[in-house]
Design a protein with these regions (language model features):
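Bacterial N-terminal signal peptides that target proteins for export
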Residues: 1-9
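Bacterial N-terminal signal peptides
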Residues: 8-18
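Sec/Tat signal peptide C-region and signal peptidase I cleavage site
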Residues: 19-23
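Short, glycine-/small- and polar/acidic-enriched structural segments
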Residues: 24-163, 169-173, 188-194, 218
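Pocket-lining segment of extracytoplasmic ligand-binding domains
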Residues: 88, 176-267
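Secondary-structure end/capping motifs
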Residues: 232-312
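Conserved C-terminal helix/tail region of periplasmic/extracytoplasmic solute-binding proteins
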Residues: 302-334
Length: 334
């Protein structure tokens, strides 16, 4: 009789646990992004038909920022679950903001990989700036101090003996405003990130002074990060999320889906789809199909951020990487 009661209690407990799991609220994942199409969070929900776990174990809320530096504050305040940080703001978040529990969980894209696109820095085609030295005494633009494009720009100008404040002035503005600022001669150089760098009007009035590869070589430009307590608490949901994300990103990277990807890009940006013929080709930045970062390149990029004075010391990126979630998710797709 006692054995029967124990069996009944065990079965009841198991059923209760299963019911509780089924009735649990999906984990809310707020994801950051800056540039439309270029950042996965801006287009991931356009293929939610491939997200088998969406609405079950997790939900997604994309959140737009002007640059990666403001994301540091947001993730520190618990306003983001996943932040797509640049190599520079990764270092700032860990060293300056004290987020030692920040973990690199996946890769977004890399700049300067051989045969692929590299970020451009543009000046007026008919303007006085012919070489980097000509920027002495001029005004250059960035999206945010400490962003990836900002740090790379400073690194290039330093190669030519030019230092911020002493030799040139930096002003900040959002990427969509930069073409007008250049054409109106309010600034002398802008960082032209994709998709803005392929704007036909910008191509008409501007020319490329240098590319990021010239300044700093291969860059693990953007990585996905999350805080360890969130990952520990929600690991199962995060594996589901990364499984869906890999399925979606691989769909975008498949050349057979290129036409539909262009149509999605046109719809998201309210631009003609034919403007996005470069998307997910070698005219685009490099995207790893497994979303695994290049930690060697990333360490060099973080070290450079230290050398430019944004952080006092460079964190060891391997100690701040947890790739087990994306690796587990990838195994499900084999």
């Amino acid at each position: 009789m006692r054995l029967s009661r124990l069996m009944f209690a065990s079965i009841a407990a198991a059923l209760f646990a299963a019911g509780a799991a089924q009735g649990a609220e999906p984990v809310k994942i707020r994801m950051s992004w800056v540039a439309p199409v270029t950042n996965w969070a801006s287009i991931i929900l356009e293929k939610k038909d491939l997200a088998r776990h969406l609405g079950k174990s997790y939900t997604i809320e994309p959140v737009r920022f002007a640059g990666t530096p403001p994301m540091v504050t947001a993730i520190a305040n618990g306003e983001l679950e996943i932040s797509n940080l640049a190599y520079s703001t990764l270092a700032i978040a860990i060293e300056n903001a004290g987020m030692d529990d920040l973990r690199i969980i996946a890769d977004e894209f890399r700049d300067g990989v051989e045969g692929y696109y590299s970020q451009e820095y543009m000046v007026l085609a008919d303007g006085p700036i012919k070489k980097v030295d000509d920027l002495k005494g001029k005004v250059v633009m960035t999206n945010a101090a400490g962003s990836a494009v900002d740090v790379a720009m400073r690194a290039m100008l330093r190669k030519f003996g030019l230092e911020d404040k002493r030799d040139y002035t930096i002003v900040e503005s959002a990427f969509p405003t930069m073409r007008a600022m250049l054409s109106e001669k309010k600034v002398d150089m802008i960082p032209a990130v994709i998709p803005f760098s392929y704007d036909p009007e910008l191509r008409r009035i501007g020319r490329t002074l240098f590319v990021q590869r010239d300044a700093i070589g291969v860059t693990d430009m953007i990585v996905w990060t999350a805080r360890k307590p969130f990952l520990d608490k929600n690991r199962a949901a995060m594996v589901d999320f990364m499984e869906d994300t890999l399925r979606i990103t691989r769909w975008y990277l498949d050349p057979s889906n290129h036409k539909e990807a262009m149509e999605i890009a046109g719809r998201v940006t309210k631009q003609p789809p034919e403007r996005f013929d470069w998307l997910f080709t070698k005219r685009d930045a490099y995207h790893d199909p497994n979303m695994l970062p290049d930690l060697v390149a990333l360490q060099k990029n973080v070290d450079m951020t230290r050398d430019l004075g944004f952080v006092k010391s460079a964190p060891d990126v391997k100690k701040h990487a947890d790739l087990s979630i994306v690796e587990e998710a990838a195994k499900r797709l084999k």
